[in-house]
From Swiss-Prot:
A GO molecular-function descriptor: rRNA binding
Any one of the GO BP annotations: translation
Protein name (Swiss-Prot/TrEMBL): Large ribosomal subunit protein uL4
Superkingdom to which the source organism belongs: Bacteria
A GO term from the CC aspect: ribonucleoprotein complex
Subunit annotation: Part of the 50S ribosomal subunit.
Function: One of the primary rRNA binding proteins, this protein initially binds near the 5'-end of the 23S rRNA. It is important during the early stages of 50S assembly. It makes multiple contacts with different domains of the 23S rRNA in the assembled 50S subunit and ribosome.
Organism of origin: Bacteroides thetaiotaomicron (strain ATCC 29148 / DSM 2079 / JCM 5827 / CCUG 10774 / NCTC 10582 / VPI-5482 / E50)
């Protein structure tokens, strides 16, 4: 499978690069994607939610009224869960939402996400990102040249590049990350994925 290679001016270089079929050309596995995204979203949760149960409420323990004959529900003290301001029954407690996911499943999910992008013509390969200094204007110009300025953009670099990161930081819908941080959720959430030629080589090393 071959795709055209562009430069950051949006010009076709006349060269093509071959995408690895075992990564970019597989039949996407939706269940693997679901599990990987579920784990990612679960790991974003702080898990610090907490409500007070009956033993944790401070207040009088005097019984409000007689047990029978009042015509209403039986209730004890002011901390009763049936009263406004009372305790909560089986309320949330601090917990860790992490769950284990096998490495093979995560790898399959990432391959599936990238394959979806290829199937939807939402993957662009560029020669390289050469930003001499952090400049938002240059990054915006690049998105316009590639005709992706109106889409959520994910730029995947082979390694960290401070100039590119800082140039894209203030642009809504633009996200920059390295191959080592390749993430199924972010790939799927992007309207277009932009890779460099070196990024493709790095992805081959990680996902094969």
């Amino acid at each position: 499978m071959e795709v055209n290679v562009y430069n950051i001016k949006g010009e076709d270089t006349g060269r093509k690069v071959t995408l690895n079929e075992s990564i970019f050309g597989i039949e996407p596995n939706d269940h693997a994607i679901y599990l990987d995204v579920k784990q990612f979203m679960a790991n974003q949760r702080q898990g610090t939610h907490k409500s007070k149960e009956r033993s944790e409420i401070s207040g009088s323990t005097r019984k409000i009224g007689r047990q029978k004959g009042g015509g209403g529900a039986r209730r004890g003290d002011m901390n009763s869960p049936v009263l406004v301001g009372g305790a909560r029954v089986f309320g949330p407690k601090p917990r860790d939402y992490f769950f284990k996911l096998n490495k093979k499943v995560k790898t399959l999910a990432r391959k599936s996400a990238l394959s979806y992008k290829v199937q939807n013509n939402a993957l662009i390969v560029v020669e390289d990102f050469v930003f001499e200094a952090p400049k938002t204007k240059d990054f915006v110009a690049m998105t316009k040249n590639l005709k992706v300025s109106d889409k959520k953009l994910l730029v995947i670099l082979p390694e960290a590049n401070k100039n590119v990161y800082l140039s894209a930081r203030n642009i809504e819908g633009a996200n920059v990350q390295t191959v080592s941080g390749l993430n199924t959720y972010r790939v799927l959430n992007a309207g277009v994925v932009v890779l460099t030629e070196n990024s493709l080589k790095a992805i081959d090393n990680i996902l094969i």
